[in-house]
Amino acid sequence: MMKAIQIHETGGPEVLRLDELPIPEPGPGQVLIRVEAVGVNFIETYFRKGTYKATLPLTLGSEGAGTVEKLGPGVTAFAEGDLVASVSIMGSYAEYALVPAEKLVKVPSRVTPEQAAAAMLQGMTAHYLAYSTFELKAGDTALVHAGAGGVGLLLTQVAVRLGAKVITTVSTEEKAALSREAGAAEVILYTEQDFEVEVKRITDGKGVDVVYDSVGKTTFEKSLNCLRPRGLLALFGASSGPVPPFDLIQLAGKGSLFVTRPTLWHYVATRQELEWRAGKILDWVATGELKLRMEHVYPLAEAAQAQIDLEARKTTGKILLEP
């Protein structure tokens, strides 16, 4: 038997249950993983609330790393004992997880399970945002909301690698220091300053080339106002709630702007893309070129508290669960 965090109904953190389940057997093309570290992400809260639909009961968890325990028929790319990591498959909030082999990547020997779980989803999100959704280049200016969060810290580092100037928004001086350490050229305390006014001041009224917005409802309108003509808003999350209905004609009046709502799954849909993005991120972690913050580690049984702290913005960097 194994322990797993499941939801049998949607709602608040109180619906998370620590259940005992049979250890599953891998079928054709599947791999059984003994989970050693689990990443906690906002996407799991969307499933918990019912924003994203799923069949219940559901074992939560979209990101994890661990050791290959058993191979299903037809799996040849991995061996028992391999350290592997995965994203995009629910089920990692558990002691064991079944994962399609095509969704797994091998973890370099210099990377720990904790580092892999901390880097995969948020690191690849940073990668696709900076390399594909809006291809950052030297001289570009980017506004990154939640600059001290898991994605924010990694996205800032990736953007700076590409030669971009990064402006971030954060809620406290402590988080501002972390954001600057990651490479942000300018940090705005949105609790004390109007970020739209500050961005206009910093850019001499020109606006930024791209806004990376994971906040949603409370930042969307002002984020649009921060863009230069023909700039792009990448709305890749909604931690403050979904954006209300919006008349697209407003984009013309604000400068022929572009808006996109990307998700990681469409940027790792092929094996080639998954290996490219995961390979880059894990290599950067292995060499120390990408710095991770993993100061918040909870036992698996405290998954509800981990989600409470995530949603309350009490944490910085990556939250992990330890089975």
Task: Briefly describe each language-model feature range.
Residues 22-39, 49-91:
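Glycine-rich beta-strand-centered segment in the early N-terminal region that forms part
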Residues 83, 141, 165, 231-232, ...:
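Short glycine-centered segments of the SAM/dcSAM-binding site in methyltransferase folds
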Residues 117-193:
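Mid-domain Rossmann-like dinucleotide-binding core that forms the NAD(H)/NADP(H) cofactor-binding site
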Residues 272-323:
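C-terminal hydrophobic helical "lid"/dimerization subdomain
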